[in-house]
Amino acid sequence: MSSGGKGKASSETKSSSRSSKAGLQFPVGRIHRLLKKGNYAQRIGSGAPVYLAAVLEYLAAEILELAGNAARDNKKSRIVPRHLQLAVRNDEELNKLLGSVVISQGGVLPHIMAELLPVKTKGKAKASQEV
């Protein structure tokens, strides 16, 4: 019996997800379902969830890369919320995007105002150089 077309019969074809077709790790189908369920618009185009999944995947990869660098700088092999906080707050664009976001257990950025630091006197510096 002929399948009516070229290639394999419809029962033999291997199905592939929209995420794999787009080369993404984030779930395109789930994002599409959530967009429809959220009543953001009456209709959701087929390209919208692919684009949104790509943007979310890029942001996640960017934050995780910076957080991994922060963890490595602190000689740790596990990313904790503190590393996420340091990564986001030290990056200008991510800090602007997530400026109003509070990261639980993230702590604060270390900063001491210049006025609060001890004053270095020139007399002590000269005395130490002469000895």
Swiss-Prot record:
GO terms for cellular component: nucleosome; nucleus. Pfam families: Histone (PF00125), Histone_H2A_C (PF16211). Residues 8-23 have a biased composition (Low complexity). Residues 1-24 are annotated as: Disordered. GO terms for biological process: DNA repair; heterochromatin formation. It is found in: Nucleus; Chromosome. In contrast to vertebrates and insects, its C-terminus is not monoubiquitinated. The [ST]-Q motif constitutes a recognition sequence for kinases from the PI3/PI4-kinase family. This is Histone H2A. It comes from Cryptococcus neoformans var. neoformans serotype D (strain JEC21 / ATCC MYA-565). The lineage of its organism: Eukaryota, Fungi, Dikarya, Basidiomycota, Agaricomycotina.
